[in-house]
A protein has these predicted regions:
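Generic beta-sheet signal
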Residues: 98, 194-197, 250, 293
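Ser/Thr-glycine-rich phosphate-binding loops at phosphate-binding pockets of nucleotides
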Residues: 80, 170-173, 230, 249
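Active-site environment of divalent metal-dependent phosphoester hydrolases
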Residues: 30, 76-79, 153, 174-179, ...
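Active-site metal-binding motif and surrounding structural segment of the metallo-beta-lactamase
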Residues: 66-71, 152-194
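Catalytic core of the metallo-beta-lactamase
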Residues: 56, 66, 70, 113-166, ...
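Short amphipathic alpha-helical segments
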Residues: 34-38, 84-86, 157, 181-184, ...
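Rhodanese-like catalytic fold shared by cysteine-dependent sulfurtransferases
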Residues: 1-22, 29-69, 76-145, 152, ...
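Accessory terminal helices/loops
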Residues: 2-5, 9, 21, 30, ...
């Protein structure tokens, strides 16, 4: 078999099908450690730099198993193809290289059906390269999106395939870790862009201000979408309760941990808000199914590869956080678990507020890489180890 080009969605399918492949990442060590291919199941991955292949071809080739299919990943497609040609020269039989480079993995969205009823269908769109989740709610021939990424063509294509008109798009907060797609979706479709003025008041986005407790529905009735203000991760953080059963929680409630309140440089002030919100969350219906905006790793997914957990289980899993009754102790806990935020987060916030504009290449550069939005990534990992 000659070398061939494959798509990011094919790589994901091979990984969840547990195919016998080796993922060969030929980026430099720094980029590899910052962001790499992840899967729900264990798989073999090697990091051997493209530059090493150029300078030490024989030694690099010797590191690869000849009895397995090789799938090459690099920052750019051309570099991966170059390494694939080296392996073909050395008589490797099944070698593929990723179309579009690592950015295509970073932008990949996987639609997973959460629930299908006569009156509605709810989808989770998993972005493995960012460890993030967005959502789509369909009723009749209308669809609403929640926290869409900048891969706007995916969402519009998803709607078109189902003969749906996009009527609303919601943000849970002003995102810092990825470039949001609501503004462009609204511009291209005429859908209403909803956001909390606590985050968006200084932006140049043409958004419609949310009101705490208000409800939305579809033209044919369908499920309700209830707005719940949950400040803390940001002052305008908002959750959405769907059909009284699900809560799209953004970066407020995670399956492991809660949203970090320090990304705006006001850790103590926002930690106070988060402490109050945690009290509010504990009073919600504990049977609500939590649908988070991010996950730490695939271990949080259920057997259907969905990131979803009943609120009572989330509270129990994170009792080391939700169980802190004293506000001063909670704020100290947050401070003890703070860590530097990626430098690009400040710029991404400006882009999402429409205060700065960049071309597609720069936006992709900013958008690439796994999120760091949990308040206590280290503490949560220790608590669940």
């Amino acid at each position: 078999m000659s070398i061939f080009k494959y798509e990011a969605k094919e790589l994901f399918q091979w990984l969840i099908d547990k195919e016998e492949i080796v993922v060969l990442d030929v980026r430099n060590d720094k980029d590899f450690k910052r962001f790499q291919v992840e899967s729900p199941y264990p798989f073999e991955m090697l990091n051997v730099s493209y530059y090493d292949f150029m300078e030490m071809e024989e030694e690099c080739v010797a590191k690869l198993p000849r009895n397995k299919n090789i799938r090459i990943v690099c920052a750019k497609e051309g570099s991966a193809k170059y390494v694939a040609e080296i392996l073909e020269k050395h008589e490797f039989k099944n070698v593929g290289y990723l179309a579009g480079g690592i950015k295509s993995w970073g932008n990949l969205l996987i639609p997973r059906l959460i629930e299908q009823q006569d009156s509605f269908a709810l989808y989770q769109f998993i972005r493995p390269g960012k460890a993030s989740c967005s959502y789509g709610l369909i009723s009749g021939n209308e669809i609403m999106f929640f926290d869409p990424s900048r891969a706007v063509d995916f969402y519009l294509g998803f709607a078109k395939q189902r003969n749906c008109t996009v009527v609303r798009t919601f943000e849970t907060h002003l995102q810092a870790d990825y470039i949001a797609g609501s503004r462009d979706i609204a511009r291209q479709t005429g859908a209403v862009f909803h956001a909390n003025e606590g985050d968006f008041s200084g932006s140049k986005n043409p958004y419609t201000k949310l009101v705490d407790g208000e409800q939305f529905t579809f033209s044919n009735g369908g499920p309700t979408v209830q707005v719940v203000f949950t400040p803390g991760h940001t002052p305008g953080s908002t959750c959405y309760i769907i059909a009284g059963t699900y809560i799209i929680s953004g970066d407020t409630i995670f399956i492991n941990s809660v949203g970090r309140p320090d990304l705006g440089g006001k850790a103590e002030e926002w930690a106070h808000l988060l402490f109050e919100t945690i009290g509010k969350v504990k009073k919600l219906d504990n049977q609500l199914q939590v649908l988070p905006g991010h996950y730490m790793d695939w271990a949080e997914a259920n057997s259907d590869l969905l990131f979803m957990l009943p609120l009572h289980e989330v509270l129990e899993r994170n009792k080391h956080i939700y169980g802190i009754a004293d506000e001063a102790a909670f704020i100290q806990f947050i401070k003890d678990n703070m860590r530097p935020q990626p430098e690009e987060y400040a710029t991404i916030r400006l882009v999402n507020a429409n205060l700065e504009q960049f071309d597609d290449e720069k936006q992709e550069e900013l958008d690439l890489g796994k999120n760091e939005c949990a308040a206590t990534a280290y503490a949560a990992a220790q608590a669940t180890a």
